[in-house]
Amino acid sequence: MSFDTAKYPTLALVDSTAELRLLPKESLPKLCDELRRYLLDSVSRSSGHFASGLGTVELTVALHYVYNTPFDQLIWDVGHQAYPHKILTGRRDRIGTIRQKGGLHPFPWRGESEYDVLSVGHSSTSISAGIGIAVAAAREEKNRRTVCVIGDGAITAGMAFEAMNHAGDIRPDMLVILNDNEMSISENVGALNNHLAQLLSGKLYSTLREGGKRVFSNVPPIKELLKRTEEHIKGMVVPGTLFEELGFNYIGPVDGHDVLGLVNTLKNMRDLKGPQFLHIMTKKGRGYEPAEKDPITFHAVPKFDPESGTLPKSSGGQPSYSKIFGDWLCETAAKDDKLMAITPAMREGSGMVEFSRKYPAQYFDVAIAEQHAVTFAAGLAIGGYKPVVAIYSTFLQRAYDQVIHDVAIQKLPVLFAIDRAGIVGADGQTHQGAFDLSYLRCIPDMVIMTPSDENECRQMLFTGYHYNDGPSAVRYPRGNALGVTLEPLQKLPIGKGVVKRHGEKVALLNFGTLLPEATQAAEALNATLVDMRFVKPLDEALIMELAGRHEALVTIEENAVMGGAGSGVNEVLMAKRKPVPVLNIGLPDHFIPQGTQDEARAEIGLTASGIEQRVRDWLA
């Protein structure tokens, strides 16, 4: 989309933060209004993360106005809220390409702009990185400032508190801003509290506070009295005791939509020494009523009509794999009150909304705490319950030690329902589910299943749920299922594949939902086709039979080729001293950027024609 300077006259003056800082402070509210309208206009035309960015407009403007970015280093946690940041840092005219193939990255990305200090996508990394950046800046001795912006969801993760605990110990000069959008602005966020925030962030208060500590450090009764008096005064309006105990100077909460107030507070805080903590209150979806009323639905949106405020309904195709999982969960819970379902803050995405409403006593959203989710599930299993951990492939990476140490070593019957496996699409490198088969396959006693359609997905969930000899995992992709008939639930024989087509010379061994593409390729090649179903344990007898009857084998999976299911087939053949040529087809050895799922698969060659051509070229 072309930029309309007449529609956004103030924003038109800002193509860099240097230009932003030339504006008179009085014009910043108008700039915020135009920036918010431009964000609505661009995202509604192109799709993307939406409600979070609407809530951080004033904060973004104030930060770039006060701090000398990119010299001063600004770090966004996760990055959903960083669209206004991208617009103000030279990417305004390309914002309509965000999340598209060849377009702007969906999150702050180091390779895209010098303003993007840390590449992000997963939550709760900003403070840890910020401490390292602040320590490096201090050694540089150029008065470079470090600011981290983290949301109220991301700060619940253990990593954020580990980082703050460390910051309180080594005391780097840095600012952590908590963007708290869980509630509307409360009554105590008004003129009095904004005035107090500026007072508490001012140099006079800081000097008196530190000076008083030094003067009275050797007079314990007076020091304790001063501490209690300070806590009493601040406690009337400041819910920051926890952050103070971690070693931060806490300021807030303040109105995150008062851009002029934010500018004043940030100016006061910029030169303070040691770790500072600013708590701001914002409203997710601010300035666009439909998003304010339903920020979860408007968190990430397709193209939509901003006038009506209604998002396009699903085209009515087949249900998603997430819904297939959610329906199975409800069906199982209706018969078994031992089922316990766990999600790390992904209720909607994992298809668990209906389950959470029907079976609230069996549903646990542990927030952004993947490590805790897995070990919590281990505890439930020890207690005689049957835990199901619903988690995205990319987020299970964050709990790898817990899978090994707390579940697998103890052979606890925990079922992992791994959503978003394989190519995810528009969220790019940080969200592709490329590695789960590789990092789970090496864990002893782990059963790993790869359904080829929704019926197999249900059967495998049922099989894993009733498997009591250790952990099991079922991985399925983002997107709609195929529309096959759903059969009555029954346990599958562990580690057994199914021959789908008999052919000559070449056998295709498929793992997962690429079976339709593999079927077309097998027909074109007159190849044998097998739905392997299990990555672990592999059907070794079937592999050896296929190797004995064919000149070559081809493995197909939507996982990294290195260490994936195909590698397991190679290992079986080598161990059995059966040196048959094997072609492993899967995800290449690089991080896959944003684009649609179809675009990514076409580029990689995971289409029917792509698979066929790869095999023909290899055999030639």
From Swiss-Prot:
<keyword id="KW-0786">Thiamine pyrophosphate</keyword>
<dbReference type="Pfam" id="PF02780">
    <property type="entry name" value="Transketolase_C"/>
</dbReference>
<feature type="binding site">
    <location>
        <begin position="153"/>
        <end position="154"/>
    </location>
    <ligand>
        <name>thiamine diphosphate</name>
    </ligand>
</feature>
<dbReference type="Pfam" id="PF13292">
    <property type="entry name" value="DXP_synthase_N"/>
</dbReference>
<keyword id="KW-0479">Metal-binding</keyword>
<keyword id="KW-0460">Magnesium</keyword>
<feature type="binding site">
    <location>
        <position position="288"/>
    </location>
    <ligand>
        <name>thiamine diphosphate</name>
    </ligand>
</feature>
<dbReference type="InterPro" id="IPR020826">
    <property type="entry name" value="Transketolase_BS"/>
</dbReference>
<dbReference type="GO" id="GO:0016114">
    <property type="term" value="P:terpenoid biosynthetic process"/>
</dbReference>
<feature type="binding site">
    <location>
        <position position="370"/>
    </location>
    <ligand>
        <name>thiamine diphosphate</name>
    </ligand>
</feature>
<dbReference type="InterPro" id="IPR005475">
    <property type="entry name" value="Transketolase-like_Pyr-bd"/>
</dbReference>
<protein>
    <recommendedName>
        <fullName>1-deoxy-D-xylulose-5-phosphate synthase</fullName>
        <ecNumber>2.2.1.7</ecNumber>
    </recommendedName>
</protein>
<dbReference type="GO" id="GO:0052865">
    <property type="term" value="P:1-deoxy-D-xylulose 5-phosphate biosynthetic process"/>
</dbReference>
<feature type="binding site">
    <location>
        <position position="181"/>
    </location>
    <ligand>
        <name>Mg(2+)</name>
    </ligand>
</feature>
<comment type="pathway">
    <text>Metabolic intermediate biosynthesis; 1-deoxy-D-xylulose 5-phosphate biosynthesis; 1-deoxy-D-xylulose 5-phosphate from D-glyceraldehyde 3-phosphate and pyruvate: step 1/1.</text>
</comment>
<dbReference type="Pfam" id="PF02779">
    <property type="entry name" value="Transket_pyr"/>
</dbReference>
<dbReference type="GO" id="GO:0019288">
    <property type="term" value="P:isopentenyl diphosphate biosynthetic process, methylerythritol 4-phosphate pathway"/>
</dbReference>
<dbReference type="InterPro" id="IPR009014">
    <property type="entry name" value="Transketo_C/PFOR_II"/>
</dbReference>
<keyword id="KW-0784">Thiamine biosynthesis</keyword>
<comment type="subunit">
    <text>Homodimer.</text>
</comment>
<keyword id="KW-0414">Isoprene biosynthesis</keyword>
<dbReference type="InterPro" id="IPR049557">
    <property type="entry name" value="Transketolase_CS"/>
</dbReference>
<dbReference type="GO" id="GO:0008661">
    <property type="term" value="F:1-deoxy-D-xylulose-5-phosphate synthase activity"/>
</dbReference>
<feature type="binding site">
    <location>
        <position position="152"/>
    </location>
    <ligand>
        <name>Mg(2+)</name>
    </ligand>
</feature>
<dbReference type="InterPro" id="IPR029061">
    <property type="entry name" value="THDP-binding"/>
</dbReference>
<feature type="binding site">
    <location>
        <position position="80"/>
    </location>
    <ligand>
        <name>thiamine diphosphate</name>
    </ligand>
</feature>
<feature type="binding site">
    <location>
        <position position="181"/>
    </location>
    <ligand>
        <name>thiamine diphosphate</name>
    </ligand>
</feature>
<dbReference type="InterPro" id="IPR033248">
    <property type="entry name" value="Transketolase_C"/>
</dbReference>
<dbReference type="InterPro" id="IPR005477">
    <property type="entry name" value="Dxylulose-5-P_synthase"/>
</dbReference>
<comment type="similarity">
    <text>Belongs to the transketolase family. DXPS subfamily.</text>
</comment>
<dbReference type="GO" id="GO:0009228">
    <property type="term" value="P:thiamine biosynthetic process"/>
</dbReference>
<dbReference type="GO" id="GO:0030976">
    <property type="term" value="F:thiamine pyrophosphate binding"/>
</dbReference>
<dbReference type="GO" id="GO:0005829">
    <property type="term" value="C:cytosol"/>
</dbReference>
<keyword id="KW-0808">Transferase</keyword>
<dbReference type="GO" id="GO:0000287">
    <property type="term" value="F:magnesium ion binding"/>
</dbReference>
<feature type="binding site">
    <location>
        <begin position="121"/>
        <end position="123"/>
    </location>
    <ligand>
        <name>thiamine diphosphate</name>
    </ligand>
</feature>
<comment type="function">
    <text>Catalyzes the acyloin condensation reaction between C atoms 2 and 3 of pyruvate and glyceraldehyde 3-phosphate to yield 1-deoxy-D-xylulose-5-phosphate (DXP).</text>
</comment>
